[in-house]
Amino acid sequence: MLPEAKLDLLLARHAALESELLSHVSADRYVQMTRELAELNPIVDAVKNWRAVTAEIAGIDAMIADPATDAEMRAMAEAERPALEARNDELMQKIRVALLPKDAMDERNVMLEVRAGTGGDEASLFAGDLFRMYERFAALQGWKVEVISASEGTMGGYKEIVAQVQGRGAYARMKFESGVHRVQRVPDTEAQGRVHTSAATVAVLPEAEEVDVDIRPDDLRIETMRAQGAGGQHVNKTESAIRITHIPTGIVVSMQDSRSQHKNRASAMNILRSRIYDAERQRINAARSADRKDQVGSGDRSERIRTYNFPQGRVTDHRINLTLYKLPQVIAGDALHELIDALTTEHQAAQLAAEGGA
């Protein structure tokens, strides 16, 4: 059964917002209301459709039970009922999912970090492939990707790249990408045609705001230095590069991508803030995980989550045992949504089961 009283409150809230929109409101209030309406619209539509279907089912049941109904009409009603039952179940499930507790971070922008792991140059190339996959996926969502820092590999790709992904719901869609991604393929430099295995680590952090993390100046060790290029040579004469250490956690962020020390410091603080915030969230989630099973995988960055097997053209997500034989489309970013959708559905099913709603 669905919580009818709660659904009535949602419908009333939706109607009140629509009515208020017709009055004179400030620009800020207008933006706030349209955002809330956009969040309510899907569940309100589902509730209205569900109630219409239940009323239709009740009408059919009454027709079937009525002795005055002739045989032909009764047969037609009985034939229509299974489709309506299926639609009813579908709408009820949609409503249950919409009523699940939301992650407060889901609407946040994302700090995306991709690092080459084991595998040398091939790992750097794979890290580059992964970053371009996410870049394309973000573009398809209408999001903006801004590279904050990048360390290129000697043969291409990246040893490490950090970017900000800006867009509504970015964290909700990308949060299950954190973990170790493994690739199996024949490198261009492999003369014998042997398949090599390499890896890259992906971290997806919700962008933290200043109010989320209290960073005391006394807890920071800030060092400046001259930026270095490939081979270690200094590339400018001013100390624009910066390294910030958060002493309590030991988290270190280095930044030298801009010639401006001020910009490098601002970027480093932004990354540091998100890493500190994420570390605390990880600690809390780890403490809770013993009591709940509503996560897709452990969320541990050291967990191997996915394998990209180029010779077989397949991608396997190990958390949900899903294999897609469309590796080119996934690595291009065009079919990544199929994996993300499946992970989201699995996560929601686990949440429903934990709440006794499945």
UniProtKB/Swiss-Prot annotation:
Major subcellular location class: cytoplasm
Q: Name one GO molecular function term.
A: translation release factor activity, codon specific
> Can you tell which superkingdom this protein's organism belongs to?
Bacteria
User: Which residues are reported to carry the modification N5-methylglutamine?
Assistant: Q233
- Keywords annotated in UniProt: Cytoplasm, Methylation, Protein biosynthesis
The cellular location(s) given in this protein's UniProt record come to:
Cytoplasm
Mind telling me which GO cellular component terms the entry cites? cytoplasm
InterPro entries from the xrefs?
PCRF (IPR005139), Pep_chain_release_fac_I (IPR000352), Pep_chain_release_fac_I_sf (IPR045853), Prokaryotic/Mito_RF (IPR050057), RF-1 (IPR004373)
Q: How is it modified after translation?
A: Methylated by PrmC. Methylation increases the termination efficiency of RF1.
**Similarity remark:** Belongs to the prokaryotic/mitochondrial release factor family.
What is the annotated role of this protein in its UniProt record? Peptide chain release factor 1 directs the termination of translation in response to the peptide chain termination codons UAG and UAA.
PANTHER family linked: LD18447P
**What is the name attached to this protein's record?**
Peptide chain release factor 1
The major lineage groups are: Bacteria, Pseudomonadati, Pseudomonadota, Alphaproteobacteria, Hyphomicrobiales
